[in-house]
Each structure stands twice: as structure tokens, then as C-alpha cells.
Amino acid sequence: MNDPIVAMSVALGGWQSKLQTASPGIIESFDRDAMTCSVQPAIKGQIRDETGAVQDVDLPMLVDCPVQFPSGGGCTLTFPVKKGDECLVVFSSRCIDSWWQSGGVQAQADLRMHDMSDGFALLGFRSQPRVIGNISSTAAQLRTDDGAAFVEVDSSTHAINATTSGAATVSAQGNITMSAPLVTINGDVKVNGRVDTTGDVKAGTISLMTHRTSGVTAGGGTSGVPVP
């Protein structure tokens, strides 16, 4: 005797198996000009062979997945996307082809729904073997995975810190202005250009503005060293 509940359950299960929502994936390649990537789904699918046995198989490569870089108001945070990076692919409920090609509000180029052809790649999700260490519990950081270089904003002290094991370069077409009660530089300073100051300059205990010189005599000779 046929059970309509069982039949409905089987039909619903078959429909659900084709419904794509989200899946972890591994970046295969990245097109930085189109801002899209190819992704290998990291969860295998299942098929039955001719004997009825279930086998795990790789799902098809997801191509032309738009990559999300956090952005808004004319500013964007970008980062390198490399082969092997892990990501989460979320699938649109409707076909994205027309929107992706032309932007704006578009008609559907195809009536497919929750399809593997309409994935967006979100980077940053990690499996346990690829987690990064030393996550700060007090500050927001822009950092390298190894932690050797970072810029952070501390939420409690409001301090901004920058650390790197390499070089640091600041370049500006306009002026650079620093305002603080005291600026401390630990290290030698080399200036390729003129130095103007509205206040005094001291070398050790010797003032540039008020120091006296020793061994002064009238005439065209050379005075002695400055007097502290």
C-alpha cells in the first residue's frame, strides 16, 4: 500500500537536495580585474552508482563568483585573494547574470532559483587547521596572518598602534601634519631637505638660540666651541 506521506517526504527530500543556500569552498583562481573567482566546493556531493551504493564526489567548480570586499561611500577594503584561501559561497535565490553584467535593477536572464551558478564568495571563514593565532581581545586589527605586521585601534584606551617587522613608508602629495604635546622618535633621524622651526633646538644641553661661544676675540678669526 502506497503511503502518500512517504511519497511526499521522498519528493521533498529530492527537491531539497537541489536547493543551494551556502557552502564552504576553496579558492582555485582569482580575477582581480573582474573581481570574481573560481571556487571548489569543500563539501562533496553524493551519488548512487549502478549498484545502488552511495559515493562521495567533488561538486562542479563554481566559476565567476563575485568576491566581496567590504566597501561603501567611495571607500573599499581590499586584500590579496590567493589559490587555497577558504571562503563561504552564498547562492542567490534568483539568477544574477543580468545584474552582474550591467548593474542596477535588471530582469532575470534565467528563471533558475538557488542555483550553483549564482554564488558570491565571502572570504575570512576558516576551518580549524587554518585558524590564525593571537586574536586580539581588546583591539580591532588590520593584520597579516602571522601577526608580524598590524595596525590596531584599542577600544578601551582609544590608542592606535602600528607594528611591523619590515619597513614603513608614508607618502603624501600634500602636507603631513602631526599634532601632539610631545613627539618621541627612538632612533637616528635623517632629513633630506630644509628644517624650519619656530622654537629652540638643543644638541645635548646646548641651545641653538641662546648658546654662547668660547675663545672669542675681535677680528677675523674663528670662535671656539659653544658654551653649554
Kindly label every feature range from the protein language model.
Residues 1-172:
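Hydrophobic packing positions characteristic
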Residues 60-62, 196, 220:
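Residue-level signal for pocket-adjacent positions within structured domains
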Residues 142, 151-164, 168-172, 176-185, ...:
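Low-complexity, small-hydrophobic/phenylalanine-enriched stretches
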Residues 221-227:
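Short, low-complexity, Pro/Ser/Thr/Gly-rich segments in the mature regions of secreted, periplasmic
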